[in-house]
């Protein structure tokens, strides 16, 4: 070994009581926050994806497939009408 960086060894960290007290709270909170982010629909708003009931309208039930990449903008505008 060429020297020490001054950091605590990983084994000491994961066997400490303080580590488990902190992480027993923060890890479940991350899962709960993610679940709330998705279940409230905020994820759809943040990332701009349509909600499951917005993919197809009553007027348009076919798949919106783009056929010509040079006319893609016009085709997308037609799909959104």
From Swiss-Prot:
Transmembrane parts of this sequence:
21-35
Instruction: Recite the UniProt cofactor note for this protein.
Output: With its partner (PsbF) binds heme. PSII binds additional chlorophylls, carotenoids and specific lipids.
Cystine bridges: none
GO molecular function ontology, one term from the record: electron transfer activity
Q: Which PANTHER family match?
A: CYTOCHROME B559 SUBUNIT BETA-RELATED (PTHR33391:SF9)
Q: Which residues bind heme?
A: 23
Task: Identify the taxonomic lineage of the organism of origin.
Answer: Bacteria, Bacillati, Cyanobacteriota, Cyanophyceae, Oscillatoriophycideae
Subunit info here reads: Heterodimer of an alpha subunit and a beta subunit. PSII is composed of 1 copy each of membrane proteins PsbA, PsbB, PsbC, PsbD, PsbE, PsbF, PsbH, PsbI, PsbJ, PsbK, PsbL, PsbM, PsbT, PsbX, PsbY, PsbZ, Psb30/Ycf12, peripheral proteins PsbO, CyanoQ (PsbQ), PsbU, PsbV and a large number of cofactors. It forms dimeric complexes.
Name the source organism.
Microcystis aeruginosa (strain NIES-843 / IAM M-2473)
The record's listing under InterPro entries reads: PSII_cyt_b559_asu, PSII_cyt_b559_asu_sf, PSII_cyt_b559_CS, PSII_cyt_b559_N, PSII_cytb559_asu_lum
Q: Where in the cell is it found?
A: Cellular thylakoid membrane
Record's keyword terms, sorted = Electron transport, Heme, Iron, Membrane, Metal-binding, Photosynthesis, Photosystem II, Thylakoid, Transmembrane, Transmembrane helix, Transport
Tell me the domain of life: Bacteria
Kindly provide the name given to this protein in its UniProt entry: Cytochrome b559 subunit alpha
User: According to its record, what are the GO cellular component terms?
Assistant: photosystem II reaction center; plasma membrane-derived thylakoid membrane
Alphabetical GO biological process terms: photosynthetic electron transport chain
Q: Per UniProt, what is the membrane topology? A: Single-pass membrane protein
Q: Which PROSITE patterns match?
A: CYTOCHROME_B559 (PS00537)
The protein's role, per its UniProt record: This b-type cytochrome is tightly associated with the reaction center of photosystem II (PSII). PSII is a light-driven water:plastoquinone oxidoreductase that uses light energy to abstract electrons from H(2)O, generating O(2) and a proton gradient subsequently used for ATP formation. It consists of a core antenna complex that captures photons, and an electron transfer chain that converts photonic excitation into a charge separation.
């Amino acid at each position: 070994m060429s020297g020490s960086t001054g950091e605590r060894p990983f084994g000491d960290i994961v066997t400490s009581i303080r580590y488990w007290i902190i992480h027993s709270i923060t890890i479940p909170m991350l899962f709960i926050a993610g679940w709330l982010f998705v279940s409230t629909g905020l994820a759809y708003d943040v990332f701009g994806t349509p909600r499951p009931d917005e993919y197809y309208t009553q007027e348009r039930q076919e798949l919106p497939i783009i056929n010509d990449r040079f006319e893609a903008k016009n085709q997308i505008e037609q799909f959104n009408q």
